[in-house]
Amino acid sequence: MKITILFLTLLVLSSSCTSIITKTMNSKETIYLDNPAVSPSIDQNLVDIHLGHSFVQGVMSFCYDCGKACFRRGKNLARCQKFVCRCTISKLR
């Protein structure tokens, strides 16, 4: 009986610790893109946006997030290569 209660107590403690750890890991990965970028000079045609992605997430998810970030700023997606996101300066029409 004591072994069963001890086992269940350890199981509950380990599952709660696991959920806390995964919650903190997921909150660190959240990226906020609502801050507007600094307006570029007139000579530039493209604006760099650094989203902070890693190779683990892959190019497809990076380019998807890149397009969403450009759309939020009211701009078109110009290029997405080598984990560099570039939006056009011209606004959406």
From Swiss-Prot:
It is found in: Secreted. Disulfide bonds join 63-80, 66-85, 70-87. Residues 1-19 form the signal peptide. Keywords: Antimicrobial, Disulfide bond, Fungicide, Plant defense, Secreted, Signal. One of its GO terms (biological process) is killing of cells of another organism. GO terms for cellular component: extracellular region; filiform apparatus. The keyword Amino-acid biosynthesis does not apply. Belongs to the DEFL family. This is Defensin-like protein 209.
